[in-house]
């Protein structure tokens, strides 16, 4: 068709044939058409691509949203489980506490019922006993009157004659008592003759003083709060068992608020446990592995403290040149007591006393101090080694000391072996001075109570005694007697009999005053 137009089209004024113009025109039109089609196709392609990208983004966002929703759901479920478990645990604890309280209330109620029943039984028993006593007393009065009449008939003596005979007998007893007291004064006067010899000892006492500590078998460690008790006990008691096994002591965790008691007869173990427990409380990490670590460190610190204490004690006692083994063993005495007196302080005091006595007697002061300082070294290991502390101490000193004077002073100061050297007498005298001075030592509470009880039992064992009281720390006994059974002369005789029984049956320091009190009241009314 283009050829037709090109052949038939006339020429234009521009010189181009019409067919050429038409061809150009149609080419332009066709280009526009194809360009439009290409543009439409390209635009469709772009739109399809954007649509696919948008679909992928939407799919990814949907997947992310599902994952996030799943995480939120899992977290919410975990929180719900945690809250439910916490609530169940708290509920169980409250139920357990309520059950415990209910058991305590039941136990207290049962105890009160038992006490009430016992009180009723005691009341009934006392009533019956009172009736029996009244009947017995009436019978005794009747028997007494009958026996008095019978005695007068048998003895062919009146009451006045019997009193005269009794006074003569008492006069003889008083003469014997006077003779005994005269002998006591004679002994006392002879003892005063030795006062000059004791002057050396008194001068030594005036120049020496030391502190005294109380003997104990327990230590109390304070706690920041009662919650710490549960942490110390641990799950199923594993922490407290680990601590007791590592230290060798007993831990007492009771109702005492904010406190734990350490009990042991070994003072070194007790000190190790105290330091370890204090560190665990401060640190807060309490479990068996940590307990073992802290106890090991505490043992090292206590050993170091014992060495330091031994060195300090040797310096205070004026004893120099001791071997490190002796210093360490002497340091153990810091935690050892005897009748309330610290043995290390006692050793320092004996060393100073021995040096002073030695200087007065003109012997080697250095050796006297050394023997006095080491005289009780056996007490540091007497829990672990068989034998007396003097034998143990002498054997230990023989290993480390070359001086025979020091060995004799240690071995002979308690007269376990025959005392043949002056060193044994010096150390023995210094030891007695340090131990016997007022306030240095005191008997244990158990022995003290036993002695008071024994005094009261002796007094109560006599007929006619109503009540007896041991007072003034056992230095006096006051006896209340029944006035209708014991008269004034009988009270005097009772006092002497009790004194004799105490002298024969008890050992006691100093003197014991026996006071018999007889009180008679006569009441009448004027009408």
Curated annotation (Swiss-Prot):
Residues 78-97 are annotated as: Disordered. The chain crosses the membrane at residues 21-41. It is a single-pass membrane protein. One of its GO terms (biological process) is mRNA catabolic process. Pfam families: HD, KH_1, RNase_Y_N. It is found in: Cell membrane. Gene3D superfamilies: Hypothetical protein af1432, K Homology domain, type 1. One of its GO terms (molecular function) is RNA endonuclease activity. Residues 217-302 form the KH domain. Residues 343-436 form the HD domain. Keywords: Cell membrane, Endonuclease, Hydrolase, Membrane, Nuclease, RNA-binding, Transmembrane, Transmembrane helix. Its EC number is 3.1.-.-. One of its GO terms (cellular component) is plasma membrane. Endoribonuclease that initiates mRNA decay. Belongs to the RNase Y family. This is Ribonuclease Y. The lineage of its organism: Bacteria, Bacillati, Chloroflexota, Dehalococcoidia, Dehalococcoidales. The gene is rny.
């Amino acid at each position: 068709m283009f050829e037709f137009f090109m052949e038939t089209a006339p020429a234009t004024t521009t010189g181009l044939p019409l067919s050429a113009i038409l061809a150009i025109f149609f080419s332009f039109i066709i280009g526009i058409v194809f360009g439009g089609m290409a543009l439409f196709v390209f635009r469709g392609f772009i739109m399809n691509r954007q649509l696919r990208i948008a679909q992928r983004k939407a799919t990814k966002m949907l997947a992310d949203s599902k994952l996030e929703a799943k995480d939120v759901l899992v977290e919410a479920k975990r929180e719900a489980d945690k809250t439910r478990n916490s609530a169940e645990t708290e509920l169980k604890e409250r139920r357990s506490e309520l059950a415990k309280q209910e058991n305590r209330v039941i136990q207290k109620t049962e105890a009160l019922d038992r006490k009430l029943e016992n009180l009723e039984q005691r009341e009934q028993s006392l009533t019956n006993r009172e009736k029996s006593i009244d009947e017995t007393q009436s019978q005794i009065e009747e028997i007494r009157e009958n026996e008095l009449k019978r005695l007068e008939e048998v003895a062919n003596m009146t009451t006045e004659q019997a009193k005269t005979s009794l006074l003569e007998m008492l006069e003889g007893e008083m003469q014997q008592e006077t003779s005994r007291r005269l002998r006591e004064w004679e002994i006392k006067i002879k003892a005063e003759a030795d006062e000059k010899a004791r002057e050396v000892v008194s001068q030594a006492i005036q120049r020496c003083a030391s502190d005294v500590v109380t003997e104990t078998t327990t230590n109390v460690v304070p706690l920041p709060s009662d919650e710490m008790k549960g942490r110390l006990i641990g799950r199923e008691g594993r922490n407290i068992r680990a601590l007791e096994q590592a230290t060798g002591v007993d831990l007492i965790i009771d109702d005492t608020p904010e406190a734990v008691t350490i009990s042991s007869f070994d003072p070194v173990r007790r000190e190790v446990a105290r330091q370890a427990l204090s560190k665990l409380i401060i640190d807060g990490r309490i479990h068996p592995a940590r307990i073992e670590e802290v106890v090991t460190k505490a043992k090292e610190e206590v050993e170091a403290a014992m060495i330091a204490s031994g060195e300090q004690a040797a310096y205070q006692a004026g004893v120099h040149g001791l071997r490190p083994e002796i210093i360490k063993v002497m340091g153990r005495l810091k935690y050892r007591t005897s009748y309330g007196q610290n043995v290390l302080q006692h050793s320092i005091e004996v060393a100073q006393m021995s040096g002073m006595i030695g200087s007065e007697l003109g012997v080697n002061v250095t050796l006297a101090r050394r023997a006095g300082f080491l005289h009780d070294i056996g007490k540091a290991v007497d829990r672990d080694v068989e034998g007396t502390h003097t034998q143990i101490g002498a054997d230990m000193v023989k290993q480390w000391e070359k001086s025979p004077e020091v060995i004799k002073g240690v071995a002979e100061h308690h007269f376990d072996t025959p005392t043949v050297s002056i060193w044994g007498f010096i150390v023995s005298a210094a030891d007695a001075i340090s131990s016997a001075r007022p306030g240095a030592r005191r008997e244990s509470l158990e022995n003290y109570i036993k002695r008071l009880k024994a005094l009261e039992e002796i007094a109560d064992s006599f007929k006619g005694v109503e009540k007896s009281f041991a007072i003034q720390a056992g230095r006096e006994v006051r006896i209340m007697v029944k006035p209708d059974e014991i008269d004034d002369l009988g009270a005097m005789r009772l006092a002497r009999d009790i004194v004799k029984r105490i002298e024969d049956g008890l050992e006691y320091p100093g003197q014991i005053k026996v006071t018999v009190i007889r009180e008679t009241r006569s009441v009448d009314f004027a009408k």
